[in-house]
Amino acid sequence: MTSGAVNPWITIETLTPEAMSVASVGDAPRGFADWQRVLQRVMARTPALYDSLKTRSLIDAIRAARDEAEDVDLTLATGSGPHALRIRPVFGPGGDVHAVRLWMGSAAATCPELPAAVGAIWDLNTQTIQQPIGATRLTGNSAEQHVPVMSIAELFHRISAFNRHAEVLDLLYSPKAGDKLQFEVTVTDGPERPGRWRISIRARDDARTQGAWLLIEDVTSDNEPSEWPTLERVGLREAHRRAGTHLAIVQTERASISHWLTDPAPWIRWDYLFRPVDVFHPDDRVRLMALSDRLQSGDTAGVTVRALNYGGGYTPTSLLLYPYPGYPSRQLAIAQLVRVADDMPMLESGRNALETPQGQAPIGYDDQLQYRLAHRLKRSPVY
């Protein structure tokens, strides 16, 4: 970094107690790079700071910002004039620090605007992603659609031109110490401006969390080239749409839908639920889980279950399941869902279809779902 360059913010993820690493430097991903080496290189290119700020002091300041969850603002006297050190924590849903962002430079220089970032937690037991209200600052999100917990299927449904679903599911459903992923996604769902997010994930299996901690950085840029699905994906999806075929990835051992491969089945309420497992009737979940061993051996399996509908009741639904090829964990299956004839109308776009039977407690975020249904795009953004 020369004296004429604008120093970027450095994002250091703190997703596990035992490790810290660099998630990004400015707009560029760093893929869990060694944070002390990165800081030493930055300081070496800023001689005034290198001469006045000891590496140990900088490390202590970063750890203090993480442990105390507070901003750090220091002004350092150097031979080239005063220099500034700024550290900002990135908070998750429990007020824990999921990352710290650091900027160093001349006190007279312009500090770049700090893009939005937020922490999230994947809880394996509930199969939900917990997110704080700060997630509404991410491009592509809105306060009207924000909920404190969401399923992984809902996250996948909001992103386009993404092909690493199996890797993500493997980490989330079989968390092992040391497992990590970093990737970028385009969020295209809803009425908001499309956003570009960089997501860093570390698996956790400890007293605090069984699942994973996430860091989501908003890296949306006006100069970002558009991402388009392949002709093959567009063609296959349109063929399934016209044929009325509905395919999903189902976690058989946990009786939940993880991802829609086609348009979601319109008679099934799968989104904005407090608990993703509520998509299937409680008495049918055990029957679905019992198919795991059979699928692991490579066989197909069929079962009829009661799937939650938008009227608050259940619609009989036939599932034809077969193993997902090449997936390392046994619980992942491809399911074809077919509606068994009944007199319950399917959800119609644009109408107030949400109902809660009298005397029944809500099972999901009905207001946010109604907002989504009223503003959803004419075509699904998922490919």
Predicted regions and their residues:
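Sensory/regulatory domains in signal-transduction proteins
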Residues: R41-S226, W267-R351
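Short, charged, intrinsically disordered terminal tails
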Residues: A341-V382
